[in-house]
């Protein structure tokens, strides 16, 4: 190893010194999320009726490779329906410690009820707090309270799910995109 090799290494180091840093001073600065980012799961409602979109079919649980989703279905009462189908999800739980955020549950859902949102700050102290129930995940078409608060401070609409090109997917009709 000669002096020339050391000079080359120092040249690379000095070159990087004057470039813009790649790191972000989180939480003071926030990096922009990519359009296909998959964060915390949310269960959506129909924009017109306010009924839950989840019909309790358990396809999301069957598609989950990490076995993180548990769905228990019940018959829907025609006088006071919870969802537009014959059944609804009486129990919907997801263990976020097991979830690998692959998005297969979102793809498997025939009604578009399961959406991977853009929330990623899910820190907590107890492991049992990472098992989200239906009440923790159910949001309207305007998003959850933290999503609305963040969107309001950023001056942009709430974004649920992702969109590659074109208009919103039919299952997410009524959900606003950036």
Swiss-Prot record:
GO MF annotation, one: quinone binding
- Residues the record lists as binding [4Fe-4S] cluster 2: 64, 99, 102, 105
GO cellular component terms, A-Z: plasma membrane
EC number(s)? 7.1.1.-
Catalytic activity annotation: a quinone + NADH + 5 H(+)(in) = a quinol + NAD(+) + 4 H(+)(out)
Annotated function: NDH-1 shuttles electrons from NADH, via FMN and iron-sulfur (Fe-S) centers, to quinones in the respiratory chain. The immediate electron acceptor for the enzyme in this species is believed to be ubiquinone. Couples the redox reaction to proton translocation (for every two electrons transferred, four hydrogen ions are translocated across the cytoplasmic membrane), and thus conserves the redox energy in a proton gradient.
Question: Which PANTHER family does the UniProt record give?
Answer: NADH DEHYDROGENASE [UBIQUINONE] IRON-SULFUR PROTEIN 8, MITOCHONDRIAL (PTHR10849:SF20), NADH DEHYDROGENASE UBIQUINONE IRON-SULFUR PROTEIN 8, MITOCHONDRIAL (PTHR10849)
Q: How does it assemble?
A: NDH-1 is composed of 15 different subunits. Subunits NuoA, H, J, K, L, M, N constitute the membrane sector of the complex.
- The name this protein carries in UniProt is NADH-quinone oxidoreductase subunit I
Q: Which organism is it from?
A: Deinococcus radiodurans (strain ATCC 13939 / DSM 20539 / JCM 16871 / CCUG 27074 / LMG 4051 / NBRC 15346 / NCIMB 9279 / VKM B-1422 / R1)
Traced from the root, the source organism's taxonomic lineage reads: Bacteria, Thermotogati, Deinococcota, Deinococci, Deinococcales
Gene from which this protein is expressed:
nuoI
